[in-house]
Amino acid sequence: MHGLVIVDSNGEPLRDSIIWCDSRAVDIGNKAYEKLGEEKCMSRLLNSPGNFTASKLKWVKENEPDIYEKIYKYMLPGDYIAYKLTGEINTTRNGLSEGIIWDYKENKTADWLLDFYGINSSLTPEIVDNFSNQGSIHVNASEQTGLNVGVPITYRAGDQPNNALALNVFDDGEVAASGGTSGVIYSITNNINSKEPSRINHFAHVNYNDDNKSIGKLLCINGAGIQYRWLRNHSVGKSYEKMNEQASSISVGSDGISVIPFGNGAERMLNNKNIGTHICNINLNKHSHGHLFRSALEGIAFSFMYGMEILKNDNAAINVIRAGNDNLFRSEIFANTVSTLIGHEIEIYNTTGAFGAARASGVLNNDLNSFREKITKNDHVMTFLPLKNRSEYEDAYSRWKEDLQGILNNKK
């Protein structure tokens, strides 16, 4: 993903990896965005340099100059794993895009950003295609892993692009969604115009190539399943199944309760505001556990809808949503709410990112047709269709947005 590994000319790491969520380079990325300008960054990087790999490399140059002088190549963590297996140092366009080192306009490494940071572009590894023979297992790796010598490495990707691959999400208008502790909406587009430098990130999707500029628009929601888990942990003896059963007895809109589920830290889609969780409009003479359970599921679903509206306002089409058969998408209330509000179906697949990556290793030269057919035939579990009583969901969502806006206004 967006971390940094640096090695010397012997291929030995020069320091511990700086992982994706390490925030030490935030100020560096923000200053670069300010000096380089929004137009250049958004038209060519589709992102702010932010706290990503290039900015982390600049941090090493500024704070650990003796280490920086010894760098032979920088890599993403996934590139380093491939190197340890094959002995070959290389990367992909997809990986460079996740490090915000890819120029979409010129379709090459963003050497101008490296130049701005004072980083020699020769430190960038050789670029290989995402679906290609990227090296083979060598003897030492074979002894340590049990993999046979000569087994080729033919695929690599970050977690969200790979999750999208596992869910058969490749084309404009297709969306991969996940609803664990946090939520992720990953929408595919061929439109490289964006005005969202912070709320949305853009990465070259796994099938991005010279002939197919497939971009993944990534929006994260910190407060998702953690909200429902918190309710379960504070409801004595309740399982998710019992909670869902009680929630299903409550009408759409939870009789006026709104749960604003943003209690897992600052939310990027709220411009990094940390507003916490709010349970609004409780009537102590009327509302029950079932109301709380349903309003929590609806509140999380409404936050997904809020995120999708941000994506749609930034040139993303949303024609179908695909998700794994786990976590929040096992809840009919949650899935029906999202499907009905967005007006499109949600397809549920019995797969994981690990299965997707294993299958992708058999894809060469971007020939994805048979790969996609197998997913559709073998993994599809069910489809949630938009319900006919959409107005009830829209009324509840409108009330939720009003409650959210009131909280945001008070945070100014």
Residue ranges of model-derived segments:
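N-terminal cofactor/phosphate-binding cores enriched in small/glycine residues
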Residues: 1-5, 11
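A conserved helix-loop-beta module that forms one wall/lid of the active-site cleft
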Residues: 117-132
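Short beta-strand to alpha-helix junction loop
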Residues: 103-105, 130-134
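Active-site core segments that coordinate phosphate-bearing ligands/cofactors
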Residues: 26, 33-90, 95, 100-111, ...
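Short, charged/polar, Gly/Pro-enriched secondary-structure boundary elements
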Residues: 12-14, 192
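Hydrophobic or amphipathic alpha-helical targeting/insertion segments
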Residues: 9-12, 31, 35
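Carbohydrate-associated surface elements
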Residues: 22
